[in-house]
């Protein structure tokens, strides 16, 4: 695995570094975030969304704009504190995928979905997304274009 060489960067807390290791019919890889001390492994797009969304919920950041309920109909409270940082910028910038590396900036989580941009590391490709479906479509578009 090659190391990505970049200038010293400061990564926002709401950024996910998606390291894509395999791409056939679906995407497989790892997600690194300042909000998690361990990589989030995913076998497909569904796991990518579910596991990272669960991490955001635990941290309360980016804040959700809807109330969540458990299966008993009870409201699940959202925490709105400053998130704990587990991964330093210097360490985050060294992470890269075997096929490609994407930085996903989640600006908000509205209407039970995500909004933000996808940036392919070391390339000019940037895609804006307004929903989970657009996020996954953008990731697959970048992978099909660049591989």
Please provide the spans of the model-predicted regions:
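Intrinsic disorder/low-complexity detector
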Residues: 1-18, 22-24, 52-112, 142-147
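Broad hydrophobic/π-residue packing in well-ordered secondary structure
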Residues: 14, 27, 41-45, 100-102, ...
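Mixed-charge, glycine-accented linear interaction segment located at domain edges/termini
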Residues: 35-43, 49-57, 117-147
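Short aromatic-glycine-(Arg/Gly/Cys) micro-motifs in beta-strand/loop hairpins
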Residues: 20-36, 107-123
